[in-house]
A protein has these predicted regions:
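Conserved double-stranded beta-helix
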Residues: 1-65, 70
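N-terminal auxiliary "cap/dimerization" subdomain that precedes the catalytic jelly-roll/cupin core
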Residues: 2-10, 107-111, 181-187
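Short catalytic/ligand-binding loop motif for oxyanion handling, primarily in non-cytosolic enzymes
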Residues: 19-21, 58-59, 73-74, 125-127, ...
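Conserved hydrophobic/aromatic beta-strand scaffold that supports enzyme active sites
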Residues: 28, 48-52, 105-107, 115-117, ...
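Short, surface-exposed loop/helix-turn segments at secondary-structure junctions
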Residues: 30-34, 89-102, 134, 153-158
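Histidine- and/or cysteine-centered catalytic micro-motif in compact active-site loops
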Residues: 32-34, 52-54, 68-70, 78, ...
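Double-stranded beta-helix
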Residues: 58-123
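Non-heme Fe(II)/2-oxoglutarate
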Residues: 112-117, 121-187
Length: 187
């Protein structure tokens, strides 16, 4: 990872990405750096490492990438709420179309134990798991030690708070919608 990042790195974050059989959430096309920049990072130097724990194939929501798209820099992202009401930043469709024409699209099929490294500007995403098999990845993000956030901690907290407030507002709207729908059914 240090060779890819060009400097000594530290683990910036990690998570388990699980897509349960028959559904699992959709991860719309995005660039990870779109989420890092508002947190004060000025350089898209974070390297993602996906360790595949299950077989990944066309049926169980494999990772989809636009190979080489990281060369485009940070693209325009739209602020949307997914089907679960979670706030997401997604690549503008006009940029997706342009990247598709220039770089193409690749479905990543992998076996358990395979590892994939990719740049935080690479366009990627995945769909629903439409199979009876789970799909799990361990994502480890490494960041060069020199790539420190320039914003103060209070600015980062403000960003996180505003994002959480948007999600709460959306949850309230969904609650009212379904409450009203349920009450109409009772009448």
């Amino acid at each position: 990872a240090s060779q890819l990042a060009g400097d000594e790195v530290y683990i910036w974050g990690s998570l388990v990405n699980l897509k349960n059989p028959w559904y699992g959430r959709v991860d719309y096309y995005h660039q990870d750096f779109a989420n890092y920049k508002p947190r004060g990072y000025t350089k898209p130097s974070v390297v993602n490492c996906f360790t595949f724990l299950d077989q990944h194939n066309i049926n169980n929501a494999p990772l989809n990438i636009f190979p080489g798209s990281h060369k485009e820099g940070l693209l325009d992202h739209l602020s949307v709420f997914d089907v679960n009401g979670m706030h997401k930043l997604v690549v503008d469709p006009k940029d997706l179309n342009r990247a598709y024409k220039k770089y193409g699209h690749k479905v990543i099929e992998a076996e358990p134990g395979d590892v994939l490294y990719f740049h935080s500007l690479l366009i990627h995403g995945s769909g629903h798991n439409s199979s009876p098999n789970p799909r799990m990845i361990i994502l480890t993000q490494v960041n060069p030690k020199k790539n420190k956030p320039v914003e103060s901690l209070s600015k980062i907290k403000e960003f996180n708070l505003s994002r959480a407030q948007k999600e709460i507002e959306q949850a309230k709207l969904r609650y009212e919608f379904y409450k009203n729908k349920y009450e109409k059914q009772l009448k």
